Amino acid sequence: MPVITLPDGSKREFAHAVSTLDVAADIGPGLAKACIAGRVNGELKDACDLIETDAELSIITAKDEEGVEILRHSCAHLLGHAIKQMWPETKMAIGPVIDNGFYYDIDLEHKLTQDDIDALEKRMLQLAKTNYDVVKRVVSWQEARDTFAARGEDYKIAILDENISKDATPALYHHEEYTDMCRGPHVPNMRFCQHFKLMSIAGAYWRGNSENKMLQRIYGTAWADKKALSTHLTRLEEAAKRDHRKIGKQLDLYHMQEEAPGMVFWHNDGWSIFLELERFIRRKLNQYTYQEVKGPLMMDRVLWERSGHWDKYSEAMFTTSSENREYAIKPMNCPGHVQIFNQGLKSYRDLPLRMAEFGCCHRNEPSGSLHGLMRVRGFTQDDAHIFCTDSQVQEEVSACIQMVYDTYATFGFENIVVKLSTRPEKRIGDDAMWDRAEEALKQALRDNNIEFTILPGEGAFYGPKIEFTLHDCLDRAWQCGTVQLDYALPSRLGATYVAEDNSRQTPVMIHRAILGSLERFLGILIEEYAGRFPTWLAPMQVVVMNITDKQADYVEEVVKFFKEQGIRASFDLRNEKIGFKIREHTLRRVPYLLVVGDQEMENKEVAVRTRDGIDLGKMRLEDFATKIHQQISLRSLKLLEE
């Protein structure tokens, strides 16, 4: 007689084994209709799975994030069902859930077109609207293999042969005549899967290996209701307008080319923004008392072996050789910073020692994963490492948290999600060390009034970690900042200091990044601002335009004055109508468009308008320069107003 404990603490006793669906029905018909799955003793289970002993149960519905993920996974199976009806010869590979949706990789000789995708979507909806039940069967490994062998599903057989133990009992999910294999859970009925859209087609190698066959990957998105789907599609339309690759080209910020995949060619205006970001972070480093250092771009393989990176990271490292020595181009800065720390004897009085670098790093990311500035092979980290004692960890982490929030607020990011990853099963050190480390991070977060979620077991083997994920204007999540404790690397590379009792001790190392990759963060900013950078970041802050040739000399005089004031200014003396010039520079997203006619020239003034079309009237040069300087010094996100 299992006793089921619900989230509110209430208990229900049953005379026999029950499923989540049975419990939901016992509570009420509305909940039974909404039930998608259950979380039984912390583990997600299908709604039909029997609970035979006392258990804690949470009933999952489409209102829960987990419920939406489950219906997305079931939509992948629905896609498989439709594909096999339309092209029975298709061989199905894998169909996982991804952010906001799902995909399925298929082996089909026919090359799918957009018309095919539209037809597939229509067939999926027809199938889902029949509201058929999804039937789960748990079978032996051999029965699962025989089932897929009879259907010619070579990829499912490969998964069974290579990834699943012969002692296992795989779950098969039957969608009428279509059968798929999955860990689950899945929706009990396809009425939950009626708000979806197929988004695109791409190529994908089986198992991500370019030596394997290229498959066709169909991407889709799925949501709990029509409104959520519509909202998501609207956001995607807005995201497409804000795509940093498109805006980067329009504004002539940067380019990339095949001869240097994943490497950025910065143009003048893009590099101007990059340098402004760097200057801003450099001021923060000075404010928080960091040393700025610069390490070599590549180091001998021996050092990477000692640090442990060679064993765990060598596939992602670019290497070269010279004079019978093998070198690796650095994928990260930390081993180099330990080498700088090791120069000269350090005392406990020297700690904490905060070391920062704008480190140029390279990682051999798969070519298929490269995406504009967001995923590159060559990038600059605003990386820092703090060497400190155990007793200093909490205070140092607290300062890092303040620095992260100060920085993000400057760019207008206020919705920050914080997660704390704690000790994994395989780890160095004893429980007492981990207790101190985790408590120090928790207390630092509490001291800053930061709400956080704990991710049990997700920390690195060498220490716990805090992750900062910012949400942009389209509510997309970008994980940028990290604060990571490291109790391993200083020891591996021989870092020590002389303690107060004259003993040699190993410092704790705190890895700290705020923007992460400057390239990626700049890509995020391009999309956040849609290219309309605040004045302090804008590559060109002011453009001055004449109405006739008569004002040309005065325009040049005005621009010279602004440049002497440290304002990024240019002129447009082309023999074009002033309306044409204004439109062109508005499209370039220049914050301030200054027009000069005879009257302005005579009175030593400029007529000021913003890129938003707001007419600010006439101003004396000194007055306008003062207002702009104030905007820049405050790093205001807004332009001047009437």
Swiss-Prot record:
Residues 1-61 form the TGS domain. Zn(2+) binds at residues 334, 385, 511. Its EC number is 6.1.1.3. It is found in: Cytoplasm. Binds 1 zinc ion per subunit. It holds the Pfam family tRNA_SAD. It comes from the Bacteria. GO terms for cellular component: cytosol. It catalyses: tRNA(Thr) + L-threonine + ATP = L-threonyl-tRNA(Thr) + AMP + diphosphate + H(+). Belongs to the class-II aminoacyl-tRNA synthetase family. This is Threonine--tRNA ligase. It comes from Shewanella baltica (strain OS155 / ATCC BAA-1091).
